[in-house]
């Protein structure tokens, strides 16, 4: 059964057991925003049932990124009447490209979704995306009725399409922040992730940061995650420059568990070989001043 926590008046975290997922719910006077919908119809229905215990408002959905546990419940919400699904441009592209492949990842907990059979198993892709090219920081605002919500992209991190959702002093961060376990680096851009975390930590209006999995944290946790990742990057550079390579011994030099460290080293080597860390410019202080959730977006 889903666990519901009201962080602020009308701002809820809805936690479900599978993947320790945190979904969000923000209430306005005219509609409500749902942040992340789970990995399939079973989890999606559990989240929806918890929401309907709180409100019967029409629903809008935001997906924080294109990993299966954050969007494969979209069809449940489409059938419940949601017509707007927000995400980053690259998130929409990734869902379209790898969504069918990702079904295999949920086949145990969500057998219907894994097989693509039954009610609410179709892939529902974003209908609305953040403005701009998708490479630089961007934002958009949604009015829920006397309740503005900001969707913003600070740069690559856990993926190339991580969107945060800010309301009042609360921000839903998806897997840009990971609490209770090491970060997942399968699709990550480690150096850019550090930059995005540090940019997030400068947004002084936010005091409660809701990770995609785990318990809400403070800005100190965000900074600590950035510091730990920066240490891992430096040690990965040392390994990469040596003749040792991403060996078993090298894994234990990183501040992560061995399996995660191996993925990190492999990902770092791939990015280094492709020079991917320079694929997009870093988030600068000027961009934060002109394109942050605290100020109107520039033209």
Question: Where are the predicted features?
Answer:
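Short catalytic-loop micro-motif centered on adjacent basic/acidic residues
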Residues: 13, 33-36, 60-63, 150-151
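Divalent metal-coordination and catalytic microenvironments
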Residues: 10, 26, 36, 51, ...
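Accessory terminal helices/loops
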Residues: 201-205, 215-299
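Conserved beta-strand hairpin/beta-sheet module of binuclear metal-dependent hydrolase folds
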Residues: 2-53, 163-174
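Short, conserved active-site entrance elements at the starts or edges of catalytic domains
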Residues: 1, 123-152
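Metallo-beta-lactamase
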Residues: 32-33, 39-41, 141, 148-227, ...
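Short acidic-hydrophobic surface loop/beta-edge motif
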Residues: 5-6, 26, 137-145, 211
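Active-site HxH/HxHxD metal-binding segment of metal-dependent hydrolases
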Residues: 45, 49-135, 231
């Amino acid at each position: 059964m889903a666990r519901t926590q009201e962080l602020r008046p009308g701002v809820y975290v809805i936690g479900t057991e599978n993947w320790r997922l945190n979904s969000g719910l923000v209430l306005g006077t005219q509609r409500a925003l749902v942040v992340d919908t789970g990995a399939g119809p079973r989890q999606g229905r559990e989240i929806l049932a918890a929401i309907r215990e709180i409100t019967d408002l029409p629903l809008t959905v935001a997906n924080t990124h294109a990993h299966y546990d954050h969007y494969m419940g979209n069809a449940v919400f489409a059938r419940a009447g949601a017509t707007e699904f927000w995400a980053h441009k690259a998130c929409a592209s990734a869902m379209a490209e790898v969504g069918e492949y990702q079904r295999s990842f949920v086949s145990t907990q969500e057998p219907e979704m894994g097989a693509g059979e039954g009610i609410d198993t179709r892939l529902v892709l974003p209908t609305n995306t953040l403005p701009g090219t998708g490479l630089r920081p961007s934002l958009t605002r949604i009015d829920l009725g006397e309740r503005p919500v900001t969707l913003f992209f600070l740069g690559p991190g856990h993926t190339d399409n991580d969107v945060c959702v800010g309301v009042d002093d609360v921000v839903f961060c998806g897997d840009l922040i990971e609490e209770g376990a090491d970060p997942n680096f399968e699709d990550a851009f480690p150096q850019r992730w550090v930059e995005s975390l540090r940019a997030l930590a400068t947004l002084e209006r936010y005091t409660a940061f809701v990770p995609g999995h785990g318990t809400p944290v403070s800005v100190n946790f965000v900074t600590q995650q950035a510091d730990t990742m920066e240490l891992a990057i430096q040690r990965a550079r040392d390994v990469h420059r040596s003749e040792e390579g991403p060996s078993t011994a090298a894994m234990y030099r990183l501040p992560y568990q061995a399996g995660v460290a191996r993925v990190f080293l492999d990902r770092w080597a791939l990015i280094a070989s492709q020079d991917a860390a320079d694929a997009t410019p870093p988030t600068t202080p000027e961009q934060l001043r002109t394109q942050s959730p605290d100020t109107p977006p520039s033209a």
